[in-house]
C-alpha cells in the first residue's frame, strides 16, 4: 500500500510543483519514507523545497507551503488525511484505518505474490553468477558470490524481470594448459580417482609455487650466470609446455581436449554437490570454453578488426584502445559516450615508442602468441547474449577486485557496437574468516564445504543445548539454521566492503543473525497455531490498534518499497536489514501486547501476525532461507 501511495504522491507533487509556479524536474527522491514513530514528519515527507529555494529566491519553508497548498487544491490521495509543512519539509500523514485495510487485505489476498510486480515489457537479464574456476574447490568467496547472486536474481524476478542465471565457469585459458602439463609430468591416476579436486589443486599450486621460486632465483644477483641460465631454461620449459598444451586445446587436439574434459567433469560434479546443499540452481552453464569452441571468439576478433576498433600490437596481439574519457556512465546505454575511432591511439603510438607511455589502456583480445584472453570471451558472451537472447541487460556478480577490468570491458563493448544493452557489474567485497584471509595461490584456501560443515556443527550444538527438537528432526532443522546463518551473513554485509564472517557468533538465535529472523517467524507460526480459527479480514477494526500495533502495520506496508530499493541497487542487503527490523518490531509487538488473550484486539493482532508470517515467508524465501515452524 505504501508503494502505491508513494507513486500517487510522486505524481501529485510533480503537478503541485508546476502549479505552484516552479520549473523543476521532480524525480523519485522527492518523496521519502519516514520513521513511523516521528509524528511530526508523517509517513512520507518531501525535501524538494530545499532544491528549489535557491533558484526561486525564496525560503524553503515558503516554497514548501506553496507546493503543499497546490497539492491540497489538486486533491490528496484518499489514504492521506493531512499534509503539513515543518522546517521546509512537506509531510504527508496517512490515515491509519485506510493503511490497515489496504495493507492487510493486500498481503492476505496476494500471499506469496505480495511485493512482486508483473511487467508487461520485462527486461531480459543475463547474469554471470557463481562462476568458479574448474579444477579448484569452491571457497568461502564463492559462497558470497553464489548466495548474493541467487538472492539478487530472485528479487529481480520478483520485480517482473526475465532472468537467466549463467554459471559462467572459468574453464578456459593458459592456466589449464599449465595444469595439463603438470598432470602429465607429475600427476597420479590413483590420486585423481580418489580425490580429483584436491589433486588438481595441489598440481595447480605446485606449478605456481615453482614458477614463483624460479622467478626469484632469476632475479637473485648472488647466483652465477651459468646457474641463472639453467634456472631460466627450467622455468621456460614448464611455461612453454603449458602454453603448448593450451594451444593444442584451442586447436581441438584430441588428447588435450580429453584431458581438459575430464578436469571439467570432475569439477562440475563436485560443484553440484555444494550447490545442491545450498539449494541454488542455474539456468545455463556456459563457461568460457563455450565461446571458444562454438566460434564466438572468432566473431569478436574478426568484427573488431573489420570495424576498425582494434589495433595490432606486438607479435599476433590485437587490442582495443580505451581512452581516459571513455569510462563515464559506460554501463548505461543511454548515457555512454565512447570514442570508437583509432585516430587518437594511432597518433599516440607514433609519438611514443613504448605502448605503456601512450595515454590509453589496451584491452587485449588476442595475446602476442595468438591465444585469446578472458576479455575476448567476455565480449563474445555479450555478443552471444544479444544474438541468442535479445538481452536488455548483461550483469556480472564478481568481486570488486575486478572493478577496473569491467569498466574496460564495458568500454570495449560499446566500441564494438553493443550500444543498446545495459552492462552492470554487481561488485562485492572479499570475505574472510577470523583465522585469516584466503588465497588460492598461497595454498590457504578456506573451502565452502568447511564453512558449511562448521555452521552445521554449531547449529546442532545449539539445538542440543535447547533440547526442544526431536532427535529425528534435529539434523534437518540444524541444516536450515546453518544455511540461514551463512546466507543472511553473505547478503546483509554492506556489499562493496570486505567483511569477516565469524561462524560461532553468527549461528545464534539472538543478535543480528539469520536464525534470529527465522526464530521470529517461528514465533508467529506458534501464535497462529494457538488460535482456534484463522481470522477474516472483514472483521478488522483498526480503531483498536495501539502504537505498537501501528508500528508493526507500518513495517508490513514497507515491504514492496524495500524490494524496489533492492531492484534499483542490485543488492539484497536492504531486504536482509528490513527482515531484521521486522523481527525486532514483531518481537516488541508480541512482548508488549496480548494476542491470543487480547480482550479488544484479538482478531486484529492475529491478522497482523498472519500478515507478518507471510512477509517472513516471502522475504526469507527471496534470500533462499527456509522458515521453520518449529525451532
From Swiss-Prot:
The keyword Magnesium does not apply. Pfam families: Arg_tRNA_synt_N, DALR_1, tRNA-synt_1d. Its EC number is 6.1.1.19. InterPro entries: aa-tRNA-synth_I_CS, Arg-tRNA-ligase, Arg-tRNA-synth_N, Arg-tRNA-synth_N_sf, ArgRS_core, DALR_anticod-bd, Rossmann-like_a/b/a_fold, tRNAsynth_Ia_anticodon-bd. It catalyses: tRNA(Arg) + L-arginine + ATP = L-arginyl-tRNA(Arg) + AMP + diphosphate. One of its GO terms (cellular component) is cytoplasm. GO terms for molecular function: arginine-tRNA ligase activity; ATP binding. A motif ('HIGH' region) lies at residues 132-142. The keyword Cell inner membrane does not apply. Keywords: Aminoacyl-tRNA synthetase, ATP-binding, Cytoplasm, Ligase, Nucleotide-binding, Plasmid, Protein biosynthesis. It is an enzyme of class 6 (ligase). One of its GO terms (biological process) is arginyl-tRNA aminoacylation. It is found in: Cytoplasm. Belongs to the class-I aminoacyl-tRNA synthetase family. This is Arginine--tRNA ligase. The lineage of its organism: Archaea, Methanobacteriati, Methanobacteriota, Stenosarchaea group, Halobacteria.
Amino acid at each position: 500500500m505504501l508503494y502505491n501511495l508513494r507513486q500517487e504522491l510522486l505524481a501529485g507533487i510533480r503537478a503541485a510543483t508546476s502549479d505552484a509556479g516552479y520549473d523543476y524536474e521532480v524525480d523519485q527522491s522527492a518523496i521519502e519514507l519516514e520513521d513511523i514513530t516521528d509524528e511530526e514528519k508523517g509517513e512520507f515527507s518531501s525535501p524538494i523545497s530545499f532544491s528549489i529555494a535557491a533558484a526561486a529566491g525564496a525560503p524553503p519553508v515558503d516554497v514548501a507551503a506553496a507546493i503543499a497548498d497546490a497539492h491540497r487544491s489538486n486533491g490528496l490521495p484518499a489514504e492521506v488525511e493531512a499534509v503539513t509543512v515543518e522546517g521546509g519539509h512537506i509531510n504527508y500523514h496517512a490515515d491509519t484505518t485506510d493503511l490497515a485495510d489496504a495493507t492487510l487485505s493486500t498481503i492476505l489476498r496476494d500471499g506469496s505474490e505480495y511485493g512482486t510486480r508483473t511487467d508487461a515489457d520485462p527486461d531480459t537479464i543475463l547474469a554471470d553468477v557463481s562462476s568458479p574456476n574448474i579444477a579448484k574447490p569452491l571457497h568461502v568467496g564463492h559462497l558470497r558470490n553464489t548466495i548474493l547472486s541467487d538472492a539478487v536474481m530472485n528479487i529481480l524476478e520478483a520485480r517482473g524481470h526475465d532472468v537467466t542465471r549463467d554459471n559462467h565457469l572459468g574453464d578456459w585459458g593458459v592456466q589449464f594448459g599449465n595444469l595439463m602439463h603438470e598432470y602429465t609430468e607429475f600427476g597420479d591416476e590413483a590420486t585423481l580417482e580418489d580425490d580429483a579436486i584436491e589433486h588438481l589443486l595441489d598440481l595447480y599450486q605446485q606449478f605456481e609455487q615453482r614458477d614463483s621460486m624460479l622467478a626469484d632465483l632469476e632475479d637473485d644477483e648472488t647466483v652465477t650466470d651459468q646457474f641463472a641460465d639453467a634456472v631460466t631454461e627450467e622455468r621456460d620449459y614448464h611455461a612453454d609446455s603449458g602454453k603448448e598444451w593450451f594451444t593444442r586445446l584451442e586447436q581441438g587436439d584430441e588428447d588435450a581436449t580429453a584431458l581438459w574434459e575430464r578436469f571439467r567433469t570432475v569439477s562440475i560434479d563436485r560443484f553440484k554437490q555444494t550447490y545442491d546443499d545450498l539449494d541454488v540452481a542455474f539456468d545455463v552453464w556456459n563457461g568460457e570454453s563455450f565461446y571458444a569452441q562454438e566460434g564466438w571468439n572468432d566473431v569478436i576478433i574478426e568484427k573488431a578488426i573489420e570495424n576498425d576498433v582494434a589495433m595490432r600490437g606486438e607479435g599476433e596481439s590485437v587490442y582495443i584502445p580505451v581512452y581516459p574519457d571513455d569510462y563515464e556512465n559506460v554501463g548505461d546505454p543511454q548515457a555512454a559516450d565512447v570514442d570508437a575511432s583509432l585516430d587518437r591511439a594511432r597518433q599516440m603510438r607514433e609519438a611514443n615508442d613504448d605502448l605503456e607511455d601512450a595515454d590509453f589502456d589496451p584491452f587485449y583480445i588476442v595475446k602476442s602468441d595468438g591465444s585469446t584472453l578472458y576479455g575476448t570471451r567476455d565480449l563474445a558472451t555479450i555478443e552471444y547474449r544479444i544474438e541468442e537472447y535479445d538481452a536488455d541487460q548483461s550483469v556480472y556478480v564478481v568481486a570488486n577486485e575486478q572493478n577496473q577490468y569491467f569498466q574496460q570491458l564495458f568500454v570495449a563493448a560499446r566500441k564494438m557496437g553493443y550500444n543498446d544493452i545495459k552492462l552492470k557489474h554487481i561488485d562485492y567485497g572479499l570475505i574472510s574468516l577470523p583465522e585469516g584471509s584466503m588465497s588460492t595461490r598461497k595454498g590457504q584456501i578456506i573451502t565452502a564445504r568447511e564453512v558449511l560443515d562448521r555452521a552445521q556443527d554449531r547449529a546442532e550444538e545449539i539445538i542440543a543445548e535447547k533440547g526442544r527438537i526431536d532427535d529425528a528432526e534435529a539434523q534437518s532443522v540444524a541444516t536450515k539454521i546453518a544455511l540461514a546463518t551463512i546466507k543472511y551473513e553473505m547478503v546483509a554485509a554492506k556489499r562493496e566492503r570486505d567483511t569477516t564472517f565469524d561462524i560461532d557468533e553468527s549461528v545464534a538465535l539472538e543478535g543480528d543473525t539469520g536464525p534470529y529472523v527465522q526464530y521470529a517467524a517461528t514465533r508467529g507460526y506458534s501464535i497462529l497455531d494457538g488460535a482456534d480459527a484463522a481470522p477474516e479480514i472483514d472483521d478488522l477494526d483498526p480503531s483498536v490498534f495501539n502504537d505498537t500495533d501501528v508500528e508493526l502495520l507500518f513495517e508490513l506496508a514497507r515491504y514492496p518499497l524495500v524490494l524496489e530499493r533492492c531492484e534499483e541497487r542490485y543488492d539484497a542487503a536492504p531486504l536482509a536489514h528490513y527482515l531484521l527490523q521486522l523481527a525486532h518490531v514483531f518481537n516488541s509487538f508480541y512482548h508488549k501486547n496480548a494476542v491470543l488473550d487480547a480482550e479488544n484486539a484479538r482478531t486484529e493482532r492475529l491478522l497482523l501476525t498472519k500478515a507478518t508470517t507471510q512477509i517472513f515467508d516471502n522475504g526469507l524465501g527471496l534470500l533462499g532461507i527456509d522458515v521453520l515452524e518449529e525451532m
